């Protein structure tokens, strides 16, 4: 329902993976504004150098795949979405804040996708303040053991409802807990069942070659 209601997608954090944005507009033909300051300068030259050097260890198709990824990247962000080479964070730190990204969108409500490697904590208060403009959010929280209280406070104070939690299996701590988790929030979500099944059938491992991480819930 959140996807059906949204008029625009603001996507924070792209890198070399824009599958979420592709899938989103495949279901809903809307405006997409993406933000990532890192995909310029030496980002692509370093990417190509690594892929071409990987031929030396037998990955003969790596250069071809590198060119293919770059070509698709350029096509998507020239024809399907607008890419701002800006760093998201608190305005007082000189970064682009949430308010500015929302001002660039004429129609509301907006869906947010946030994966900005720890800077998400700088804009949590802004997300809460602008919650009436939002219909859904997917956000990845990093270094969660250091920010448990902030995450709990955000969940309790945000007017959208937490509908799904996905552990990122790329990195785990000494207690087999994920160092990052992905959370999905929706406005007025439709209840589908009285039972919650985790992992959800649509869940996918972030890194297929690594083991699945089980979520451990505690009383709030």
Go through the PLM ranges and name each one.
Residues 1-94, 107, 143:
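SAM cofactor-binding core of SAM-dependent methyltransferases
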Residues 8-10, 20-33, 43-46, 99-220:
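Conserved acidic-Pro-Pro-aromatic motif
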């Amino acid at each position: 329902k959140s996807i059906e209601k949204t008029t625009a997608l603001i996507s924070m954090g792209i890198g070399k993976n824009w599958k979420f944005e592709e899938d989103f507009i495949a279901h809903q033909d809307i405006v997409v504004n993406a933000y990532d300051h890192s995909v310029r300068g030496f980002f692509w030259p370093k990417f190509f150098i690594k892929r071409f050097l990987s031929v030396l260890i037998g990955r003969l198709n790596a250069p071809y795949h590198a060119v293919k990824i770059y070509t698709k990247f350029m096509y998507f962000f020239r024809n399907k979405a607008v890419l701002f080479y800006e760093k998201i964070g608190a305005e007082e730190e000189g970064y682009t804040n949430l308010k500015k990204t929302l001002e660039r969108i004429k129609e509301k409500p907006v869906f947010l996708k946030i994966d900005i490697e720890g800077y998400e904590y700088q804009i949590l208060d802004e997300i809460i303040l602008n919650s009436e403009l939002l219909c859904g959010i997917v956000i990845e929280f990093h270094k969660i053991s250091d920010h448990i209280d902030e995450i709990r406070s955000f969940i309790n104070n945000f007017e959208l409802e937490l509908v799904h939690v996905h552990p990122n299996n790329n990195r785990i701590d000494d207690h087999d807990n994920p160092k990052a988790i992905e959370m999905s929030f929706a406005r007025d979500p439709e209840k589908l069942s009285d039972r919650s099944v985790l992992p959800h059938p649509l869940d996918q491992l972030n890194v297929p070659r690594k083991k699945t991480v089980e979520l451990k819930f505690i009383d709030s």
